[in-house]
Amino acid sequence: MNPISYWQRLKVAFQYVMPQIYMTQAAGWLAKQKWGAMTHFVIKAFAKKYNIDMSIAEKEKFSDYASFNEFFIRPLKENARPINQNPTALCCPADGRVSECGHIEDDRLLQAKGHFFSLNDLLAEDKDLTETFKNGEFVTTYLSPRDYHRVHMPCDGTLRKMIYVPGDLFSVNPFLAKHVPNLFARNERVICVFDTEFGTMVQILVGATITASIGTVWAGVINPPRHNEVKEWTYEGESAVKLSKGQEMGWFQLGSTVINLFQAGQVQIADHLSVDEPVRMGEILALKK
């Protein structure tokens, strides 16, 4: 790996000393304000800066959004993201870019070139889950500020468990993924465990700096409030939540990362997926073995 510059070192160092929680709380407060013309001006400037395509949004006019949060989790027009109908295929859960993907080497996942992190740490030291996914497959998808920020199901699934894991709020952009050790295993996250025809699948919504909230369609907003301990919910019998392939399952209010885990021998990651590959929700993510 090439050495990083002085300014890049400062950028990394700032992540460790900045008041992550307070910055995120401030961003969340600002994003939910309804300030009329000022809000519309900020939304328009943001869309221009990040070259956001509003033609696929259900509401194309900036003036149709009362707050920045409404804009950020804007729904798309019907059929803007067709769902691959191959019954042996899993589809991408979100728009974004592939941060990393491939084989889980025993208990190790690749975070960035030359940097690994622990499956056990990622799964909040849940021993049963860790054993379930050892030597399995994974895909990490980074959602940039310009991307659509609702998260969908790669396949039909029945929710069995949800785990909220408190943690840091480092930025998760590709540069910092290369320079902050154990980034995804130290950030705040929501772990969702599903039974599927492709075996047990986990979909993890990872928080980040100024990701003011993470929510799911069955539980609503998970955070805030933020907690200092791991919280777990189980869903059995009539309380089990059933979701269909392509159905929305959650969202971020400001960008972050989705990590998918699959059991060993169940799926093969799609051949076209590689690091920094742009993906759209609904495209092929993996195929049943």
Write out the residue ranges for each language-model feature.
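Contiguous, well-folded functional domains in the mature portion of proteins
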Residues: M1-K289
